[in-house]
Amino acid sequence: MRLSIEVPAAAKDPAALPRPEIQVIKTKIPGCVELRFPAIEDTRGYFAKIFHRPLWEDLGLCTQFEEEYLTHSVAGALRGLHLQVPPMQQDKLVLCLRGQAWDVALDLRRGSPTYGQHISRDLDSAASISALYLPVGVAHGFCVTGSEALFYYKVSSLYSPAHDAGVHWESAGISWPVQNPIVSPRDQTLLPLSDFRSPFNFKP
């Protein structure tokens, strides 16, 4: 006896599959976008999709990631402003999984209309599920504004200490919303923005 199984049209043609209703919000920094993910809730909790390759390709976002990280930070901690320089430069996706934080992106691409400028946003994991996508040449940092913050990262190249770089957190005109933050010795020794010689060129 042979079974006849009907294959759904969507399985034959991936383009026919439904796409998630991810909200894409452009920022003033070219290529840097906020992604807001809808949650499907029921009595058990919720479900949310944060990565959908076909949609990301349509948006021109990186889909090839090499590493993923988690960082847990306590109240008053400040991390940043970080990026990697060529040839280990990184596209980066940053998501706050738990807690409250103030998130910052700083454009360090020569020729960019927003070079040296930053964007910031308040994050509260209990209020929404959202991520920030940072293209190559945009540095990232954040400070914890609640009792803690758990961050998740996806990056497009492997971590390389020899190419790890950044800009001092006090040098870019950013009004951080915490006083006397907890900052690592390494972050305290980063160059000020005025002394940073950017190896990144903006590509419209």
PLM regions: where:
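Short beta-strand His + acidic residue motifs that chelate non-heme Fe in jelly-roll/DSBH
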Residues: 104, 132, 140-145
